[in-house]
Amino acid sequence: MSTIDLLRHGEPRGGVRYRGDGVDDPLSERGWEQMWAAVAQTSDWTHVVTSPLRRCREFAEMLARRLALPLDADPRLREVGFGAWEGRRHEEIREADPEAYLAFFRDAVHHRPPGAEPLDRFYARVREGILAIFDEHPEGHVLLVCHLGVIRAATALALEMPLATFYRMHTPYAGRIRLRRTMRGIELWIGQ
């Protein structure tokens, strides 16, 4: 049985804003504390995989060194791109373009920010990355340091959920879910 623990990065510097694959802030001091606390009780991983973005990669590199584990960075597992909204605060967008902001929250599949990555394309690349981890580590226990969007896509994969429900899920900074590939397919484990 293959297991992947998906760990969302900790709080980044710069506050709450649209931070996709175009804004690469490092972790804040609090973000580092969140990450170390999240992994304090677990060390049975056989491999670490990370998004190449700093808020994931820098912690993954340090943890892999500390645990003497192999590390891979996979660009398929970077955050979804938010186009023109990258780096902007929610309030700023809501005030500047309330119609687009509301349309996005009502139907994020068909009302993407200008220049944003299409949600179906994002899901396809994350799905490919997750399945590759399962294929490359058929008996392994992999830690994947990633983003909220990647966790949403992984949840949608496991539960065969429509992309229209994508933004109804939330995982806090340094929050974690687990996927297992079994005879039944990919299973989602919460609160392991």
Could you tell me what each predicted segment is?
Residues H147:
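Short basic (Lys/Arg) and small-residue
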Residues W36-A40, Y123, R127-D135:
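Generic structural signal for well-ordered alpha-helical scaffold segments
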Residues R13, R55-R57, E79-G81, V150-R152:
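Short, active-site-adjacent cap segments at secondary-structure transitions
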Residues R66-R125, E187-I190:
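Phosphate-handling substructures
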